[in-house]
């Protein structure tokens, strides 16, 4: 079969056989071509024309292609969709080739190995992960080619592996073919990553991995390193020593809780805006932005480490002018980590090195500024900063101030840096000066005032004369070179001679400049470890000034840490406060301690229960990353873990219902929480029948109270459960206040002691714009239930009885005894508000967005 194809197609098929899982971009002249199934699939994914060509067989071969100069955009599209792309280049000059031009794959681009382009967000890492399965757990290794960072951790539970991979947003996971298929499928679906198989012989342990403890982490990282070697086919010298960490060194937040709390992205839109990261991000560098995300993902649990950050933040708050100067300096610092990575990979251009030079210019001032702060640790930080002055001198001496993007156009190297280059430039300049004089000489010689001397890349130098003046030219002196519509272009023997000298000089200039730049690039490589250390120092300073800036601008307070007490006075949800006018936000207290470990929260839907619960979790996270918190006063314990059961959504991927997801998340907290954990349970049990739900809710409350003792906020609509306050000494009731005003429920968003005594379900249904006749029917049914107490006269409906105590059914503000309800008179202002309500599609909004809209409309009624 192979023999029936042309030699070039045979070459293609041979290379493609080695890269079956990737699109093969096969270089043909100025295009990357794809053939056969690759072409069919690429034409669909990239929306490009599918054609065909003769390949030597009876049938024509499907083909499509993209121009090499714009290939990056097409490659990016494929990578975003989870595909891999193998770049196959011509490795010999076609003019010198005997037979088919030699080609080979020079790089395999995968979702986890993208080095540049729009596929890389400047404030996010691009980690690739490797997971290995062992008898007692899993090895996890992470590497970011763009920054050189490497991490490794041994984890007992696969759920924690998924949480770590989710935290770092790894786009690709490398496993062996023996890895459990079901587990691999879970990793792919829950983490949204591409799974890649690596079964190659693992190379000998390299220098950056020699310190790894145990065979588990060594095997896991070396599998990842082997995969990177195979795909990148170039030096990986910029990779830093593997940093080994343990989950217990930081606050543990499982995958679901990270999503529920919207730490780095929102649940609905998956965007940064609206998340805690969005709120806090006052960083000025890409490096600082990445470090901030890492800090949010892994809050500290050692008081000494937290307090060290707090002290630096407080110092920067107290030095306003120095902080503002620091922010301005950091703004001029480019991404040192990724610049170092580009240097190591050999794809750095002159403009990148100019960015490096401009960044290094800022470092001495930053070092001096930090050293001037009145704080011992700040002075120690300043003392450790290496400005890399020798590298700055080298770049200042060698690089042209405004080089082109291309490395083949010249103008890269400064005058005076290299003697031979200066000689070539003098030759080129002298020749061009001669040509500039030639135009005046020829005009004088011929008497043609419109005569021009010009140049283009196709025809070189020429003398242009309009056709009306051709009769003035001397016969035999001018050789025709090009005919235009209204003019002729000529060359003379003297011009031809100078052209050869100039073009030779310019060609020599470009070649020599490229050689000098390559040498310069190799010299810069020697500075990579120092640049990486400097990048780490700059990113830490940036993250700390970010905390100081947000804390001062938003009037946050420094939290104090306690053994067991929670005392938040006038606390605010940081993100909600930002999206609302700060004067409108209703702050709330949270008091918990030795005799108050659990809060049972009751109140209407959309009154702010979930916001209040998230608020406490976010304040705790902010405190443990070293930031100040939105409160008048904050005393907090150091939590080892945070668990949340908030929201309701079916897990369609794994075929789990809302209630099953709810129970699994509850189990995760119950099994893994300690007395030092924080648990948020929102509406546990609502996904099943009333009796089942109430029974489960009560049992969970009792279990957490009696067996775990963790700080727990438990919101519920089962008002019957509020009697547990009398039976469980650590449980206290609180509720969200709501009042009726002119037939309208006003949510006050205030947390008060005690249990709520009313529900507003029908009111919320009205806000959701359910049909009027449905609302009326609900009110009729509710009236009947109120009249019959706990024995509703409804056929085929189980008799409802409290799991804890018997109480009458919930009352409605909208029912008035047995009197027939009448529609109240509505004012013009109320009509306007009602119309505004009708235009809002609450079902497409998050609870937070809906609450904000309701609050705005409520203000109009006041």
From Swiss-Prot:
Gene Ontology cellular component? cytosol
Q: Which residues bind ATP?
A: 603-610
What are the alphabetically sorted keywords of the record? ATP-binding, DNA damage, DNA repair, DNA-binding, Nucleotide-binding
Q: Which GO terms describe its molecular function?
A: ATP binding; ATP-dependent DNA damage sensor activity; damaged DNA binding; mismatched DNA binding
Q: Which domain of life is it from?
A: Bacteria
Instruction: State a single Pfam family of this protein.
Output: MutS_II
One GO biological-process annotation of the entry reads: mismatch repair
- Reply yes or no: does the keyword Cytoplasm apply: no
Q: Does the keyword Ion transport apply?
A: no
The residues forming the signal peptide are none
SUPFAM superfamilies in UniProt: DNA repair protein MutS, domain I (SSF55271), DNA repair protein MutS, domain II (SSF53150), DNA repair protein MutS, domain III (SSF48334), P-loop containing nucleoside triphosphate hydrolases (SSF52540)
* UniProt cross-references to SMART domains, sorted A to Z: MUTSac (SM00534), MUTSd (SM00533)
Xref: NCBIfam families:
mutS1, PRK05399.1
State what this protein does: This protein is involved in the repair of mismatches in DNA. It is possible that it carries out the mismatch recognition step. This protein has a weak ATPase activity.
Q: Please state which protein family the record places this protein in.
A: Belongs to the DNA mismatch repair MutS family.
The entry's protein name is DNA mismatch repair protein MutS
Organism, per UniProt? Bacillus velezensis (strain DSM 23117 / BGSC 10A6 / LMG 26770 / FZB42)
High-level lineage: Bacteria, Bacillati, Bacillota, Bacilli, Bacillales
């Amino acid at each position: 079969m192979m023999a029936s194809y042309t030699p070039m197609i045979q070459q293609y098929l041979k290379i493609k056989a080695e890269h079956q899982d990737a699109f093969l971009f096969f270089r043909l002249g100025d295009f990357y071509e794809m053939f056969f199934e690759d072409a069919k699939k690429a034409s669909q994914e990239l929306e490009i024309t599918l054609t065909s060509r003769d390949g030597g067989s009876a049938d024509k071969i499907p083909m499509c292609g993209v121009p090499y100069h714009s290939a990056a955009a097409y490659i990016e599209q494929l990578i975003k969709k989870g595909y891999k792309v193998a770049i196959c280049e011509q490795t010999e000059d076609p003019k010198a080739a005997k037979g088919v031009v030699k080609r080979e794959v020079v790089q395999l681009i995968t979702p986890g190995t993208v080095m540049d382009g729009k596929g890389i967000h400047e404030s996010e890492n691009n980690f690739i992960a490797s997971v290995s399965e062992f008898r007692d757990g899993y090895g996890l290794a992470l590497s970011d080619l763009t920054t050189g960072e490497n991490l490794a951790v041994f984890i007992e539970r696969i759920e924690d592996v998924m949480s770590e991979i989710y935290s770092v947003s790894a786009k690709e996971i490398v496993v062996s073919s023996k890895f459990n298929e079901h587990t691999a499928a879970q990793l792919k679906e829950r983490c949204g990553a591409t799974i890649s198989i690596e079964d190659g012989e693992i190379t000998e342990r390299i220098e950056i991995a020699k310190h790894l403890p145990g065979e588990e982490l060594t095997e896991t990282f070396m599998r990842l390193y082997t995969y990177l070697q195979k795909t990148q086919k170039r030096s990986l010298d910029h990779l830093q020593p593997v940093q080994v960490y343990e989950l217990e060194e930081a606050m543990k937040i499982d995958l679901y809780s990270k999503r529920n709390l919207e730490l780095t992205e929102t649940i609905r839109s998956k965007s940064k805006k609206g998340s805690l990261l969005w709120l806090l991000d006052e960083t000025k560098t890409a490096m600082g932005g990445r470090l901030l995300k890492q800090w949010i993902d892994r809050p500290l649990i050692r008081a000494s480490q937290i307090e060290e950050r707090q002290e630096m933040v407080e110092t920067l708050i107290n030095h306003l002018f120095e902080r503002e100067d620091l922010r301005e300096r950091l703004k001029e610092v480019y991404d040192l980590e990724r610049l170092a990575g580009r240097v190591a990979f050999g794809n750095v251009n002159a403009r990148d090195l100019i960015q490096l030079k401009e960044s290094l210019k800022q470092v001495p001032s930053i070092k001096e500024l930090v050293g001037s702060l009145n704080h011992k640790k700040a002075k120690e930080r300043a003392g450790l900063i290496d400005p890399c002055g020798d590298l700055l001198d080298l770049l200042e001496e060698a690089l042209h101030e405004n080089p082109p993007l291309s490395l083949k156009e010249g103008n890269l190297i400064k005058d005076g840096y290299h003697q031979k280059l200066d000689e070539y430039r003098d030759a080129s300049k002298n020749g061009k000066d001669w040509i500039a004089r030639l135009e005046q000489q020829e005009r004088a010689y011929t008497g043609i005032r419109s005569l021009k001397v010009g140049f283009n890349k196709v025809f070189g130098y020429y003398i242009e004369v309009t056709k009306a003046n051709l009769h003035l030219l001397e016969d035999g002196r001018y050789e025709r070179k090009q005919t235009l519509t209204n003019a002729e272009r000529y060359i003379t023997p003297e011009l031809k001679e100078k052209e050869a000298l100039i073009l030779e000089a310019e060609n020599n200039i470009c070649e020599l400049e490229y050689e000098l730049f390559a040498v310069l690039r190799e010299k810069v490589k020697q500075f990579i470890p120092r640049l990486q250390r400097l990048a780490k120092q700059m990113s830490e300073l940036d993250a700390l000034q970010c905390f100081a800036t947000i804390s001062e601008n938003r009037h946050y307070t420094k939290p104090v840490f306690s053994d067991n007490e929670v005392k938040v006075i006038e606390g605010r949800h940081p993100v909600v406060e930002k999206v609302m006018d700060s004067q409108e936000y209703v702050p709330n207290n949270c008091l918990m301690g030795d005799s108050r470990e659990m809060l049972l929260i009751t109140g209407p839907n959309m009154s702010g229960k979930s916001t209040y619960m998230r608020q406490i979790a976010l304040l705790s996270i902010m405190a443990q990353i070293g930031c100040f918190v939105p409160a008048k006063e904050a005393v907090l314990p150091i939590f080892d873990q945070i668990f949340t059961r908030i929201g309701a959504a079916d897990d369609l991927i794994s075929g789990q219902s809302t209630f099953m997801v709810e129970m699994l998340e509850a189990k995760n907290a119950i099994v893994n929480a300690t007395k030092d954990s924080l648990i948020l349970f929102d509406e546990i049990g609502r996904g099943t029948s009333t009796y089942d739900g109430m029974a489960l809710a009560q049992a969970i409350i009792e279990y957490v109270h009696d067996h775990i003792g963790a700080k727990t906020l438990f919101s519920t609509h089962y008002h019957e459960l509020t009697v547990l306050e009398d039976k469980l000494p650590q449980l206290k009731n609180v509720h969200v206040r709501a009042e009726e005003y002119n037939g309208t429920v006003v949510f006050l968003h205030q947390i008060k002691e005690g249990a709520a005594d009313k529900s507003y379900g029908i009111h919320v249904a009205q806000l959701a714009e359910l049909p009027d006749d449905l609302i009326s029917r609900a009110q009729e049914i509710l009236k009947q239930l109120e009249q019959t107490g706990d024995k509703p006269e409804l056929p085929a409906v189980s008799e409802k009885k409290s799991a804890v105590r018997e109480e009458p059914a919930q009352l409605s503000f909208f029912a008035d005894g047995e009197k027939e309800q009448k529609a109240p008179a509505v004012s013009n202002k109320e009509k306007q508000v009602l119309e505004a309500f009708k235009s809002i599609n609450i079902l497409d909004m998050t609870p937070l967005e809906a609450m904000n809209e309701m609050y705005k409309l409520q203000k109009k009624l006041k």
